[in-house]
């Protein structure tokens, strides 16, 4: 008896693969992808809104013959992402009161000095916001030569808005808004600052006392991103 006869002349039927589970999986993955990207865009939009500062109002009584200072150009939050941060000891900052809270500028300045940055000038009132009506966390203002210093300061004050003005030196201003809290760098920011300090100490100091920065500081890009990944 042949094998076909033994099986009763029955040919095994081809079992079709059901595409439904695969389709369901593709749909689920698509929904998850849309959810993740929506969350990313929403988070970016939220933090942009949270760090945005209102424009200054004109002073009620301006000194005769004296033009109000220019507010500068507001930059995007990621505008300094490709800029190497400066060593903290080479950052010179002036803290300004733009919210009307007494003594806050002096207290914040002391916190910054404790973090390793230096004083550019004594804390004072903000000439750009003479009515003390800055309703945001604050602004970091700098010129073309102070981008590295501003990058370092943005690690300490990640919720401050970046503003580029026409100053020619490397000093940086930190103007405090009504939503400003205090200086609280996260773990990643502390690591970056420590690495910058360590790298700066290893750089040669030529005659004249001014250290020459050779090369780029070996700072991990993911640490820089994490240092500013905060809730504002």
Residue ranges and their predicted role:
Residues 17-25, 74-85, 206-213:
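Short, charged N-terminal helix-start/capping segments
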Residues 47, 178, 182-232:
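Extracellularly exposed regions in secreted/surface proteins, prominently low-complexity, repeat-rich
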Residues 6, 63, 70, 74, ...:
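Intrinsically disordered, low-complexity segments enriched in small/polar residues
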Residues 72, 150-154, 190-193, 197:
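Generic detector of well-ordered alpha-helical segments enriched in charged/polar residues
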Residues 4, 8-25, 35-39, 107, ...:
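BRCT (BRCA1 C-terminal) domain core and associated BRCT-interaction motifs
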Residues 44-113, 121-123, 127, 228, ...:
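Extracytoplasmic low-complexity, Pro/Thr/Ser/Ala/Gly-rich segments
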Residues 4, 8-11, 71-72, 77-80, ...:
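Intrinsically disordered, low-complexity regions
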Residues 2-55, 221, 227-230:
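Terminal domain-initiation and capping elements
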């Amino acid at each position: 008896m042949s094998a076909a006869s033994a099986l009763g002349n029955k040919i095994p039927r081809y079992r079709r693969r059901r595409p439904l589970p695969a389709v369901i999986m593709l749909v689920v993955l698509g929904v998850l992808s849309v959810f993740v990207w929506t969350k990313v865009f929403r988070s970016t939009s939220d933090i942009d809104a949270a760090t945005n500062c209102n424009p200054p109002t004109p002073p009620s009584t301006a000194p005769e013959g004296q033009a109000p200072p220019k507010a500068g150009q507001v930059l995007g939050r990621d505008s300094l992402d490709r800029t190497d941060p400066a060593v903290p000891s080479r950052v010179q900052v002036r803290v300004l009161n733009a919210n009307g809270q007494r003594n806050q500028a002096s207290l914040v300045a002391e916190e910054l000095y404790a973090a390793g940055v230096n004083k550019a000038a004594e804390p004072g009132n903000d000439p750009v916001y003479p009515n003390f009506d800055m309703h945001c966390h604050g602004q970091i203002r700098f010129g073309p030569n102070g981008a590295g210093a501003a990058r370092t300061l943005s690690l300490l004050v990640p919720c401050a808005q970046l503003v580029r003005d026409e100053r020619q030196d490397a000093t940086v201003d930190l103007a405090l808004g009504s939503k400003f809290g205090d200086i609280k760098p996260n773990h990643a920011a502390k690591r970056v600052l420590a690495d910058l300090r360590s790298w700066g100490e290893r750089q040669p100091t030529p005659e004249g006392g001014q250290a020459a920065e050779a090369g780029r500081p070996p700072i991990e890009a993911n640490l820089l991103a994490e240092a500013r990944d905060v809730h504002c």
